[in-house]
Amino acid sequence: NAEGQLKGYVRSTLLRHFADSNQALFLGSANKSDLLLGFGTPEGEFEGDLQHLGDLYKTEVLEMGHFIGLPEAVLEKTPSRCRTPRATDEDELGAPWAQVDDILIQLQNQVDPQSMIDKGMDALTVHRTMRMLQDNQGHFQKIPVLPTGRNNKSIEKAREAEASSLA
């Protein structure tokens, strides 16, 4: 909705102005889940010189918040982009972030979607998440993300393949 997008634009414009006025870096707050699914706009939620949370899934950001001792009131707040009154991320996604992140992580690790469904994941949630991922493929690749340096199965498989080809 237009009013919701305007809120994101105004917020990011004010933050950009503050950062520029103070010769500071504007750190964005987009996480990997948001970026993969296009759950934001480049001029709004995805604005920033660097997305320092951009390599962490939404659920990992919450785990980090618990670890560093953020107030429970902040951590337990229902995720919402505040685009429309009382609308939550779960309403827009059709599932809680924990389920969506589980699907994204398994897809990153090249798990077959049908095997996820066969193991009990909701088929609609798996397919909806895949559609959102495919719809946004490549749209936000130019957004600078601070990598965490963690390994995933894709990287491990590539390293194993490289090692075996050298042998």
Predicted features, each with a name:
Residues 1-167:
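ATP/NTP-dependent adenylation/nucleotidyl-transfer catalytic domains that generate, transfer
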